[in-house]
Amino acid sequence: MDDTLFQLKFTSKQLERLAKKAEKDSKSEQAKVKKALQQKNVECARVYAENAIRKKNEGLNWLRMASRVDAVASKVQTALTMKGVAKNMTQVTKALDKALSSMDLQKVSAVMDKFETQVQNLDVHTSVMEDSMSSATTLSTPQQQVDDLILQIAEESGLEVEDQLSQLPAGASALGETSARAQEKEDQLSRRLAALRN
């Protein structure tokens, strides 16, 4: 059982490393998006953005899997602990029977204290196990994410992509709508800032 626990923890660490690698790859693809936008190549930027989002989702999936494996490791750890607790409970029960048969109140009190401690430990272990388990949901890669990533990188880099939107095939992007929304928000903020200054 200890070997199983070790293997589960080792696997969890491997999955976490894969998640970090995927995140690093995603950042690399985002840098390529920026470079493509600087070269006014929106179509390549779109491909790199899709790669970046796919890698990011891949990283999230590796992380979810690592979490699930870690949860199983926690269950195995809890099972091992419960086995030890059950053994201790058996010993406590035998000691309680012995103390009761001799009717020594000090011994009975000491055994009861030990028994209560074991029950509290059992409650803590059960609580930890329940808290470690949570359901994971999978993410899809909607087109809007690609468009948002392109806009975000363009805005961070101070690049204009609106004039390049005409290069995209019809219906291939919602960037125009998103860009208009961003511009509207910026206009509203500018008006509010001007009102505050006056």
Swiss-Prot record:
Coiled-coil regions, chain positions = 7-41, 176-198
- Statement: the UniProt record of this protein carries the keyword Coiled coil: yes
Stated membrane topology is: Peripheral membrane protein
Tell me which GO cellular component terms the UniProt record holds: ESCRT III complex; multivesicular body
One Pfam short name: Snf7
Write out the GO biological process terms.
cerebellum development; endosome transport via multivesicular body sorting pathway; late endosome to vacuole transport; protein transport
Q: Which residues form the signal peptide?
A: none
Gene3D superfamilies membership: 6.10.140.1230
Q: Identify the domain of life.
A: Eukaryota
Q: Where is this region: Disordered?
A: 171-198
Annotated knockout phenotype: Reduced cerebellar and forebrain volume. The phenotype of these animals resemble that seen in those after bmi1 knockdown, supporting a link between chmp1a and bmi1. In chmp1a knockdown models, the internal granule and molecular layers were more severely affected than the Purkinje cells, which are consistent with the relatively preserved folia observed in humans with CHMP1A mutations.
Question: From the record, which residues define motif MIT-interacting motif?
Answer: 187-197
In which compartments does the protein localize?
Answer: Cytoplasm; Endosome membrane
Could you tell me the keywords of this UniProt record? Coiled coil, Cytoplasm, Endosome, Membrane, Protein transport, Transport
Q: What is its main location?
A: cytoplasm
What job does the chain carry out?
A: Probable peripherally associated component of the endosomal sorting required for transport complex III (ESCRT-III) which is involved in multivesicular bodies (MVBs) formation and sorting of endosomal cargo proteins into MVBs. MVBs contain intraluminal vesicles (ILVs) that are generated by invagination and scission from the limiting membrane of the endosome and mostly are delivered to lysosomes enabling degradation of membrane proteins, such as stimulated growth factor receptors, lysosomal enzymes and lipids.
Q: Hey, which family's this protein in?
A: Belongs to the SNF7 family.
What is the annotated quaternary arrangement, including any partners? Answer: Probable peripherally associated component of the endosomal sorting required for transport complex III (ESCRT-III).
Q: What is the protein named?
A: Charged multivesicular body protein 1a
* Record organism: Danio rerio
Gene designation: chmp1a
